[in-house]
Amino acid sequence: MRFLHTADWHVGKKLNGFDLLAEQHDAFLKINQLAKDYKVDAVVVAGDLYDRSVPSEEAVEELNKDLIRMNLKEGWPLLAVSGNHDSAVRLATGGAWFKATNFFMHTTVAQAIEEPVTLGDTQFFLLPFFGLQEVRNYFGDPEIRDLKTAMARIVAKMEEEFDPDRTHVLVAHFFAAGSSHTDSETQTEVGGLDAVPVDLMAPFDYVALGHLHNKNALQAPRVKYAGSPLKFSASEVNLDKGVWIVDTQPFNLQWVPLEPLHDLVKLTGSFDELATVEYASHYQEDDFFVIELTDTAPIPDLMNKLRHYYPKIIALSRVNKAADQSHLAAPAQDLENKDPLALLSDFYHQVTGEELSDNQRQWAKDALLAAQKEEEG
């Protein structure tokens, strides 16, 4: 059979405060079209359907439309697991109902082991993001203390359910040993329980992973991250985004890129080079920008000036950070003796070219006082 492997949709996510629902809607329409173009038999979503465990109404509406389009309108079986950003309990609501339309949403270890999904020549095991306590409870073994042991027990139990006449695919959401991550996954998110050694997954013919946003995060021929369909942080600016098309018999793997509605673009140059209508005209106004300046002198109100040309700046830095901060240099003794509020005020002025307002100054005083009290116990 042939299926499409995608993951880490993060519906409702914002990119440094900028809403992404329009970009996500466009990406899902394109995924839907790819599924039609490649005549897939099923669609796999390997976790993190939502960006938050309690998503916004707009995010829920968007995901519902996308799932209905794929499952009810196009008729593709959907195989999905909950990720660490999802609420397993909320996603599980309606599970029995979904199953009647070939929408399989697994949110527990018990489901992953006891309810493999057979479609055509393939048996799918759908393993959600899990905590060690859930695995201890399932096996009745309090000695399971790390992810490697937990996964070894889970995979061994899954093997007992293998149909020898079928291909076996694991759909999961975790951090695999040897993977690299990007800034849109924090250490706690990717590290969570530590890592799963790749060799533990050897019994499976293919492992469709979610959790990391880079398709190249792991170099294993049959263990793949799909990555996210959009760029979700400055560190992802050069990453390819797309989906895997997987054929089971004979096995074949094809990467198909997705063209974003609005791209995340990195610009490097001096302020005078970048802050012109001519330079900005090479890009869509609604693109997202990571800007790296080569200037060394301070530029008052820098961000606002750049946003006149590039409204959606998500990150701003200098090529020469040491030179950038040279105008802020002061003897260590002077810094130690200076009032924290004065330091903050100086920094704010250097960055924005403006003075703190009365409200900002009062907020800073309150925050500094609270921090001091907490430090003193």
Please place each PLM-identified region on the residue numbering.
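A conserved active-site cap/scaffold subdomain adjacent to cofactor or substrate pockets
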Residues: V198-D199, D205-P260
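Short, conserved loop/helix-junction motifs that constitute active-site signature segments
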Residues: L72-E74, F162-P164, D199-P203, S281-Q284, ...
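Short, well-ordered beta-strand micro-motif
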Residues: P116-T118, I245-D247, E292
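Accessory, non-catalytic peripheral segments of nucleic-acid enzymes
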Residues: D37, T248-G377
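N-terminal active-site segment of His-dependent metallophosphoesterases
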Residues: M1-I68, G75, N359-A370
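Divalent metal-coordination and catalytic microenvironments
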Residues: D8, F28, V43, D48, ...
